[in-house]
């Protein structure tokens, strides 16, 4: 995205000029880096560029491609440990490579959903079933919390689905006492809090620096725009409101109501929230019709990515608690496509979870003798055909 690329260039210029993370410089004044976006990438990418004297393009490639490769290696390792069958391992590699290729083609901050899912879930599934690795499992839970928190600050809610998955698995699937389960959940949340405290400290330092060094600077509270995205999401289908899936569509609407409102400010979000509520209240048919159109696209992605894993989960169940954990996580990541637009970018976290679900379901089915059952079924059918002829 060109606007994000420009913002990263300004973030690097600000870091080179001041030495303070998350301070941008546009050639005229200092300003907050990534004000209307999630700050993680505006911290890590300029840091890489500054530390190793690289261009912003090189740093973007190192960050996104490097993280994709690391998460791919971790996920393959996790599934190789989880499954003993080489058939299951082969299927996992094929599925993960396909997902990695799609993620690479989409690119940008949407990749962070894939990083979190691939880096954590396969290894977690292995560790939760191995009582001999309690110490490693405990450390993994804490580090997972830090990773999820970092992902959240790099792309809003990029780790929330994984957090949901881990908590449900810890509380309902793990075969330990309730006190120990609650302790692990608390440890997971402590890890998340470590990331939150760190990034909030960076923001606080940034704001203090700008107040002292940039004349007339007013502290801001940056957050990922929600109602802006929901409003333009109504532009998925042709409509009577003139809404299109374009930032300018929301911007023009706000300006028609309040010409002096600053783009993506709190007042801006409040105005769009009111417009969304009006549409929901007075045109429910349009809202429901649009929602089901988006759900239909998401369902198609589910069928493609989970594919025969859906059938495998029916005939060879993994246990209700694991199913619940997966489906609540998948459902959460589907919300991005349903609330905004069901593009492959917005649904990349949904696609990644569906793929991991499919791989896991097939692997568990093979462990329960699915291949032997299929072979026996085909043999019986062959005998029946011979008898009838």
PLM region spans:
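Membrane-proximal stem/loop segments at transmembrane-domain junctions that anchor or position
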Residues: 1-27, 205-294
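Loop-to-helix entry region of an early transmembrane alpha helix in multi-pass inner-membrane enzymes
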Residues: 30-73
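Aromatic- and kink-enriched transmembrane "portal" helix at the membrane-lumen/periplasm boundary
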Residues: 57-61, 68, 93-116, 148-149, ...
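Transmembrane-helix motifs of polytopic, lipid-linked glycan transferases
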Residues: 62-86, 119-123, 306-309
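Hydrophobic, aromatic-rich transmembrane alpha-helices
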Residues: 70-79, 296-320, 370-378
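Transmembrane-helix signature of polytopic, membrane-embedded enzymes
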Residues: 76-101, 134-135, 320-324
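Membrane-interface transmembrane helices that cradle and orient dolichyl/undecaprenyl
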Residues: 118-140
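Membrane-interface alpha helices of multi-pass inner-membrane proteins
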Residues: 140-155, 167, 187-196
């Amino acid at each position: 995205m060109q606007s994000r690329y420009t913002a990263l260039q300004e973030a690097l210029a600000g870091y080179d000029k001041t030495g303070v993370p998350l301070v941008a410089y546009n050639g005229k004044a200092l300003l907050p880096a990534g004000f209307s976006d999630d700050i993680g990438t505006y911290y890590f990418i300029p840091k890489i560029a500054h530390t190793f004297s690289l261009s912003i393009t090189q740093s973007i490639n190192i960050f996104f491609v490097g993280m994709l490769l690391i998460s791919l290696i971790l996920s393959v390792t996790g599934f190789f440990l989880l499954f003993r069958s080489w058939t299951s391992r082969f299927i996992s590699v094929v599925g993960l490579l396909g997902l990695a290729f799609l993620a690479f083609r989409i690119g940008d901050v949407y990749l962070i959903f894939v990083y979190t899912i691939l880096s954590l879930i396969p290894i977690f599934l292995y560790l939760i079933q191995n009582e001999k690795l309690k110490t490693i499992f405990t450390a993994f839970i804490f580090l997972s919390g830090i990773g999820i928190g970092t992902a959240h600050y790099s792309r809003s809610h990029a780790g929330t689905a994984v957090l949901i998955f881990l908590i449900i698995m810890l509380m309902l699937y793990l075969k330990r006492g309730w006190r120990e389960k609650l302790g692990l959940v608390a440890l997971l949340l402590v890890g998340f809090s470590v990331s939150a405290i760190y990034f909030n400290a960076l923001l606080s330092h940034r704001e203090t620096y700008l107040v002292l060094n940039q004349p007339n600077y007013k502290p801001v509270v940056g957050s990922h725009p929600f109602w802006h995205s929901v409003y333009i999401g109504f532009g998925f289908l042709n409509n009577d409101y003139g809404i299109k899936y374009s930032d300018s569509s929301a911007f023009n609407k706000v300006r028609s109501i309040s010409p002096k409102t600053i783009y993506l400010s709190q007042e801006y979000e409040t105005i769009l929230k009111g417009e969304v509520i009006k549409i929901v209240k007075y045109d429910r048919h349009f809202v429901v019709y649009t929602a089901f159109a988006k759900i239909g696209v998401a369902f198609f992605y589910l069928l493609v990515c989970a594919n025969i894993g859906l059938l495998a989960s029916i005939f060879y169940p993994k246990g209700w608690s694991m199913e619940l954990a997966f489906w609540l996580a998948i459902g959460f990541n589907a919300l991005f496509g349903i609330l905004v637009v069901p593009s492959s970018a917005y649904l990349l976290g949904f696609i990644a979870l569906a793929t991991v679900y499919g791989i896991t379901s097939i692997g568990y089915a093979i462990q329960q003798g699915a291949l032997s059952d299929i072979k026996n079924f085909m043999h019986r059918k062959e005998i029946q055909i011979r008898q009838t002829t």
